[in-house]
Structure formats: structure tokens, C-alpha cells
Amino acid sequence: MIDYFILDKEKKRLRLYDAYREDGFCKCFENIEKIQIEKNSEKEKQTRVIIIETKDSELPISIEIDKDNNIIGYSNLQLTQVGDNFLEYNKQLSELNLPQLIQVGDGFLEQNEQLSELNLPQLTQVGHNFLQWNNQLSELNLPQLTQVGDGFLEQNEQLNELNLPQLIKVGDVFLKLNEQLSELNLPQLTQVGHNFLGCNNQLSELNLPQLTQVGHYFIPWNEQLSKLNLPQLTQVGDGFLLCNNQLRELNLPQLTQVGEGFLE
């Protein structure tokens, strides 16, 4: 047993302990050729490293586990795509190295409690509930990301640094309930869904120069934002800027269509 998976050394396969669950992590280990388990060279860590060689890759995959067999580290240098619910129920992962990852499905690392930094330099597209409820994540760098689904980084209480320079389109509930983020720059963003940046109490600076369309409840219940300039915005839904008590300056030169409860 490792975490909630069964690693079968004889049959050379990894499967879920609960067959009724689905986890994209399992599909990263098809066509296994060799499994080797080693003690970590750093004695104080009291961890072990599982090294897996597959027929599909020249480079080995490594999984680090703690003394209780929880997965705390994962490195796969050639992985480009993962399916839904990747390590969704893992709570102890603190190191993740996926330098070639391009696309992920829904529920990616949804309930992780230890990951504090993450760099996915090639990632371009993610599904719903990406890194949702990750209480320790403070820095995230996704320089190639262009599109995200619903629930992106929802309720990440420690996130204070976010780099998404190529992001163009986001779904509903983007970055809701993020209590530490004070600045956000999304220079290429053009379209957002409902409840964008809801309840971000520390957000005081926001730059969205290309934004043209937003859904309902754009930046509701923000307590710090005093200035907002959206030079390309043409259309907004209901509840635009609901309960933004500190907003003093607003510039929307291209706006032509608004929903109900505008600036309520």
C-alpha cells in the first residue's frame, strides 16, 4: 500500500485500493518494466523512494513516500497529460516535478494540504477544480496557461503570488475565497465566468487590460480595491462589483451592456 493505492511488484501495476474511485495518477504507470524501492540517502528524512521504469519512457519515474507510506513527492520528467482526479485525495504531497505537463483534467490535487510551491512551465489547459482547497500553496507559476475551467484555485488561503501571463479565458468561481492575494495581473485575459475573485478581502491592485466580457458577480465582497480600470470591457452580468465598499475610481470607457444590480 502506498497512500490509497496498491503497488503490485509481481504484476508490475499500480491500482486504487477502492476500485470505485477514479484517479488519473494510476494511468501514469502503464507498461511498467521494473520497480525498485530504495531508502532515502538523507537519513533524517526517514523516507523511501520508489523508482519505476516503463516501456514508454527512457527516464524513470520516482515516488517518495514517508514512514506511513503517504506519497510526499512525485517526479515524472516526460509526462504531458493527466486525466481527472489526479491525486485528488492525497493530503501529504509537498514536492511535484512535472516539467513537460501540458494538460490536466478535473480535480487536480484538489485536497492537498502540504504543497507550498508549484511550477508547471509547459501547462496550457486545466479542467475544473484545479488545486481547490490547497491550504498551504503560497506561490504558483504557470507561464503558458491559457484556459481554465470552474473552481480554479478556490479557497487557497495562503496564496500570495500568482503568475499567469498568458491566461485568456477562465470559468466560474475563479480564485474565490483567497485571503492573502493582494495583487493580480492578467494581461491577456479576455473572458471570465461567474463569481470572479469573490471574497478576496486583501486584493487591492488588479490589472485586466484586455478583458471584454464578464459573467455575474464580478469581484463581489472585496474590501480593499479602490481603483479599477477595464478599458476594453463591453459586457457584464448581474451584481457587478457587489459590496465593494472601498471602490472610489472606476473607468469603463467601452461598456455597452450591463445586467441587474450594477454597482449595488
Protein language model regions, located:
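Intrinsically disordered, low-structural-confidence terminal and linker regions
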Residues: 8-9
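Cullin-RING E3 adaptor/co-adaptor recruitment helices
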Residues: 16-18
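LRR N-terminal entry segment and analogous cap-like coil->beta motifs
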Residues: 22-93, 97-98, 103-105, 127
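Structural signature of tandem-repeat unit edges
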Residues: 59-60, 67-80, 92-102, 114-124, ...
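Concave beta-strand-loop units of leucine-rich repeat
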Residues: 76-77, 85-92, 103-114, 127-136, ...
